[in-house]
From Swiss-Prot:
Physiological role: Accessory component of the proton-transporting vacuolar (V)-ATPase protein pump involved in intracellular iron homeostasis. May be involved in Golgi homeostasis.
PANTHER family with a match to the protein in the record: COILED-COIL DOMAIN-CONTAINING PROTEIN 115
Chain segments carrying region Disordered: 109-140
Keyword Coiled coil listed: yes
Recorded name of the encoding gene: vma22
Basic and acidic residues bias spans: 114-140
GO biological process: intracellular iron ion homeostasis; vacuolar proton-transporting V-type ATPase complex assembly
Gene3D superfamilies named among the record's database cross-references: 1.10.287.3240
Protein name per Swiss-Prot or TrEMBL: Vacuolar ATPase assembly protein VMA22
Species in which this protein is naturally found: Danio rerio (Zebrafish)
GO molecular function terms attached to this record: unfolded protein binding
Keyword field: Coiled coil, Cytoplasmic vesicle, Endoplasmic reticulum, Endosome, Lysosome
Length: 206
């Protein structure tokens, strides 16, 4: 019984140490990316000019390109996920194209089956083309605030800070997992200590 308890505690401790090591690696990577991003912005300012890369170029209306979704798992552990708007826009675009393709297939069948519905089919086709041609609202790339042709340094800065967002979410999830692991380990150690003290009292009484 005690062997199983000790083994379980050892496994829990090893897991805890592995999680701490992973957290340290992610934090180092995060700091490195932040430094890289700011250094790239500094180089872009040097080549374009300070006034060309500043808050003055920000759009009057902004929309976030990334959202953080949180969920509570079993045991009280919080999980964080990063959802990017460009991914959702791409999925929506693909779904729209599939829906339009299905409608066009249905129209062709109706035209071949019933000659009387040719005019109605043409009207439906025109509506489908109108929906296809109409521009869908998309999130504007923030790089375009600073011009059409921006230096590579500015693109590198954007890429670095995008990864910073993703990595920050991973770190938050890992920190929550570490807290849960530590709490579980503390509970096991407390139970073991109580059993040990109880056993010692029984020995003294004998």
């Amino acid at each position: 019984m005690r062997v199983d308890e000790n083994l379980r505690l050892d496994e829990q401790l090893l897991l805890f140490m592995e999680q701490l090591e992973a957290l340290e690696e992610k934090r180092q990577r995060l700091n490195s990316l932040i430094e890289e991003g700011w250094f790239s912005i500094a180089k872009a300012r040097y080549s374009m000019g300070n006034k060309q890369v500043s808050a003055l170029q920000y759009a009057s209306e902004m929309q976030p390109l990334a959202h953080v979704e949180t969920s509570l798992l079993e045991g009280g552990t919080a999980e964080f996920k990063c959802e990017r708007s460009e991914n959702k826009a791409e999925e929506q675009k693909t779904k729209t194209i599939e829906d339009i393709g299905a409608k066009e297939t249905g129209l062709r069948r109706r035209v071949h089956t019933k000659q009387k519905e040719v005019k109605e089919g043409e009207q439906d086709t025109d509506e489908v083309k109108t929906k296809t041609d109409s521009p869908t609202p998309e999130h504007r790339n923030p790089l375009k605030w600073f011009g059409i042709l921006v230096p590579q340094n500015l693109k590198q800065a954007q890429s670095a800070f995008k990864e910073v967002i993703t990595l920050s979410v991973e770190i938050a999830s890992l920190q929550s997992t570490i807290l849960a692991t530590r709490k579980e380990m503390q509970v096991q150690m407390k139970e073991k200590q109580e059993r040990t003290e109880k056993a010692q009292l029984e020995v003294k009484e004998e």
